[in-house]
Amino acid sequence: MKSTKELRTVAVRVPPRTTGAERRSAKAVLEVAAVCAGTGMALIVASDGAAGWRLARVAGVVTVVLGVLSLSRRRSITGLAVAGALFGLVVAPAGGAIGFPSLSRTGWSLRAGGGVLAALAGLVLLAVGTTLAARAVPGWRRLLGVPAALLGAYVVGMPVAVAVFATNVARTPLGSETPADRGLAFADASFVTSDGVTLSGWYVPSTNRAGVVVAHGASSTRSTVLDQAAVLARHGYGVLLFDARGLGRSGGRGMNLGWYGDEDMAAAVGYLEGRPDVDPGRIGAVGMSMGGEEAIGAMGADPRLQAVVAEGATGRGIGDLAWLDEAYGIRGRIQQQVSRLTYAMADLLTDARPPASLRSSVAAGAPRPVLLIAAGRVDEERLAGEFIREADPARVELWVVPGAAHTDALRAEPEAWEARVTGFLDANLRPAR
């Protein structure tokens, strides 16, 4: 016979079990929460964009919900619990990051209500699903739940959060400075994109018949590129600074991955093309970070852009991250997969379509030249720049600025920046003979 102590030990090792009634109740909760979460996400993804694309995104959400619900037919609740927890891990941060800010800014709307519903239902899925899944794991193995939860948060939660914040950008107000603070005469400018968004900017007239679009980075405005614009204006270039859509005084919805860049840049080039002081065959672009990526993308799609300077450009899609594998090995491959989920989620949350990779845009822009500027203190910029340059080393120049931070090359090396950038533009925006 076993001793009392041995019996107690055995009893401790028996995992708690759910009764049939508890199992049915838990299944019902998970099913209702999954439907509510799916409804909320459907309201979010159907809130903007072309009708066909809205329908496709809603169909994707419905497919996921049906997949989760299909697991409720099984006798074991574990599969449903795990699927529910994973679904909750996605929709809770996505719904919360969209719903509550929308509610505070604009009050109740389909988008705000959908976000709040998805967030609350996602939390229920996450809590109930995780609890039930943990009950199915015996003894010490439950301790593995902590690192598993952290891994899940990194692999799923973080990409979702990044995608949500990239596609739901708070409007950044225009700064108080204008070109006049740099001693430049200017005029207000506005122009409309091909999809009907009005963009706002400043224009400094040209004295050398060439024009340059100057594009800012994510979550900022034209005010942040005044220093770069002033350098170009001193050399006679007409300079158009504009707020990307959804930022500053421009209309539309912001997108920090730069996926609307082709449309925005095309409209900006069109504005310069129509200026009487600008030769339409002498138009270039200088972009910082997201603006640099947009300028490269625009060159691949718009033959009117004759030369591009891109500082701090690394990528805006999964095709731009192929260098991670070679540079960082297994860590790079993991980062690629995490980023793949980020871009997939972003694609679900916005009407903007994923753009061509920077490398393919450079190839499509041949034979027009590109100058890439990378921060010496940011290894990823150099590595990404080398990867982009491989598309056509003969016409893509990479300048790594020692000691410079992200988009800080002008401050770190003002004389060198002025000489390199204006020299590049002078050489490639010359009058046609």
Tell me the role of every PLM-derived stretch.
Residues 4, 35-62, 142-192:
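An N-terminal hydrophobic leader/cap segment in hydrolases
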Residues 80-133:
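Membrane-embedded alpha-helical segments of integral membrane proteins
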Residues 170, 298-351, 361-363, 368-369, ...:
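Hydrolase active-site cap/lid region
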Residues 191, 200-202, 220, 345-425, ...:
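Serine-hydrolase catalytic core
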Residues 209-217:
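Short beta-strand element of the alpha/beta-hydrolase
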Residues 218-231, 244, 251, 383:
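The serine-hydrolase catalytic nucleophile loop
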Residues 224, 255-276:
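Alpha/beta-hydrolase active-site loop
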Residues 276-289:
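Alpha/beta-hydrolase fold nucleophile elbow
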